[in-house]
């Protein structure tokens, strides 16, 4: 379970709550933590994960839209808020105001997905190098050090390399980058989630806001999900997570 400061507040739940992605797509927390330190050359700019244009609230250990949950060991995954939390400033030097369910117009999701795969493809992604970086920032127990070195790191690399096939369309020269604030939601669903064979379809769109959903009338054929397959907001949440949330 996640801490009460997340589960007891609807806004915090939206921004940092788990939707179950940690099980299959989660990245071990300490690997996630050190990747920008090890591979700054693979980031789109300086600033660690901030280079991807994520929304990051002051004092939080993770950006908005990144959940942390223990599934055997702490893992990090994305939730809906990655793409659907926006920010604005009333003046150039003012602190940002964050708006949950707004479109994240600064997120470079294309670059983030490629970053994870490119790190795993690099020969520097190995137990010796990762453990050296992890040991600089935390003191793992003896058992955890063994698990990371001999189990967690090798399996993480294997799983990330498997994503290269699922994300092969991100590397096609005839497909341009999506741009900030955009994603190719249907191809993500087809190739990454349900693993359909790849075709030549390409359709990045602006990330939409999620507010005022009451205007969509399912009885008139207006479906909530962009794919048009459902009017149920819970349809993207694994059943085990629905039980836990309820």
Residue ranges with predicted function:
Residues 1-91, 100, 111, 115-246:
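Extended surface/linker regions that mediate inter-domain or inter-protein docking
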Residues 95-107:
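Short cysteine/histidine-rich metal-coordination sites, predominantly Zn2+-binding motifs
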């Amino acid at each position: 379970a996640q801490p009460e400061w997340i589960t007891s507040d609807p806004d915090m739940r939206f921004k940092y709550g788990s939707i179950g992605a940690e099980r299959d797509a989660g990245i071990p927390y300490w690997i996630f933590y050190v990747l920008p330190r090890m591979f700054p050359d693979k980031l789109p700019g300086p600033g660690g994960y901030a280079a991807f244009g994520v929304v990051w609230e002051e004092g939080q250990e993770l950006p908005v839209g990144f959940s942390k949950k223990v599934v055997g060991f702490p893992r990090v995954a994305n939730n809906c808020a990655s793409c659907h939390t926006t920010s604005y400033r009333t003046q150039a030097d003012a602190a940002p105001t964050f708006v949950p369910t707004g479109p994240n117009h600064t997120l470079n999701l294309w670059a983030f997905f490629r970053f994870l795969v490119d790190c795993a493809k690099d020969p520097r992604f190995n137990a010796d190098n990762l453990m050296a970086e992890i040991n600089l920032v935390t003191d793992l127990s003896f058992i955890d050090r063994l698990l990371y070195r001999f189990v967690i790191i090798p399996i993480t690399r294997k799983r990330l390399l498997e994503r290269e096939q699922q994300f092969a369309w991100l590397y096609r020269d005839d497909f341009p980058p999506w741009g900030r604030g955009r994603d190719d939601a249907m191809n993500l669903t087809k190739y990454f989630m349900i693993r359909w064979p790849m075709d030549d379809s390409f359709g990045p769109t602006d990330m939409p806001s999620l507010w005022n959903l009451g205007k969509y009338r399912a009885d008139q054929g207006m479906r909530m999900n962009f794919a048009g397959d459902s009017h149920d907001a819970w349809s993207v949440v694994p059943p085990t997570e629905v039980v836990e949330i309820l």
